[in-house]
C-alpha cells in the first residue's frame, strides 16, 4: 500500500505538480513530511483508565506506540494540575505515514456517516492540513464491541508546501476527497 502511494507520488504527482507550478528545482516540489494523530482525553483527569484505552486505540489505528501528552499549566476550573497526563499523540513518517494515508483515504473516510467530502478550508496558511475525526469507529482496526466511549481525534498532515493552494493540489492528487 505505502509503496503504491510512493510510486504514485514519484511517477505521477511530482511531475504534475512541477508542470502546474513551474518549480525551479525538483526539491521545491511539495511532499508530505509527516502525519500527526492527536487524541485529547479530557476525562483522564478523573479516570486514568480512559487514557489507557485512548492509548490502546491510537496504537491500533497508527501501528505505533503513542506519546502521552501532559498539561502545560494548571487550570482550576477543569481540576487540572500542571504535568497531569491529558492525551496521546503519534507522529507518523515514512512507510507508516503512507500506510495510514492510504487507509484514511480509501477505507476510513468513506465509512463516515453522511460523508460528502472533507472541508477544503482547514489549511493553516503554511501548507498543512488539519482534519478532525468525530469518532474512532471509522477505522477498521477498532472493534465496535470493545469501545466503551466514542472519542475523536485530530489528524494533521504536514507538507513541505509553501502555500495552501500547493498543499491542496498535492492532497487532491493523492486522492483526498475534498467537498466540491
Curated annotation (Swiss-Prot):
Enumerate the Pfam families for this protein: Ribosomal_L5, Ribosomal_L5_C
Q: Please give the Gene Ontology molecular function terms for this protein.
A: rRNA binding; structural constituent of ribosome; tRNA binding
Q: Name one GO biological process term.
A: translation
Does the keyword field hold rRNA-binding? yes
Q: Which InterPro entries match?
A: Ribosomal_uL5, Ribosomal_uL5_bac-type, Ribosomal_uL5_C, Ribosomal_uL5_CS, Ribosomal_uL5_dom_sf, Ribosomal_uL5_N
Supply the Gene3D superfamilies for this chain: 3.30.1440.10
**Keyword entries, A-Z:** Ribonucleoprotein, Ribosomal protein, RNA-binding, rRNA-binding, tRNA-binding
Q: Which GO terms describe its cellular component?
A: ribonucleoprotein complex; ribosome
> HAMAP family from the entry?
Ribosomal_uL5_B
What NCBIfam families does the record point to? PRK00010.1 (NF000585)
Against PANTHER family, the record matches this protein to: 60S RIBOSOMAL PROTEIN L11-RELATED (PTHR11994)
| Subunit organization | Part of the 50S ribosomal subunit; part of the 5S rRNA/L5/L18/L25 subcomplex. Contacts the 5S rRNA and the P site tRNA. Forms a bridge to the 30S subunit in the 70S ribosome.
Q: What does this gene product do?
A: This is one of the proteins that bind and probably mediate the attachment of the 5S RNA into the large ribosomal subunit, where it forms part of the central protuberance. In the 70S ribosome it contacts protein S13 of the 30S subunit (bridge B1b), connecting the 2 subunits; this bridge is implicated in subunit movement. Contacts the P site tRNA; the 5S rRNA and some of its associated proteins might help stabilize positioning of ribosome-bound tRNAs.
As for family, the record states:
Belongs to the universal ribosomal protein uL5 family.
Quote the protein name from its UniProt record.
Answer: Large ribosomal subunit protein uL5
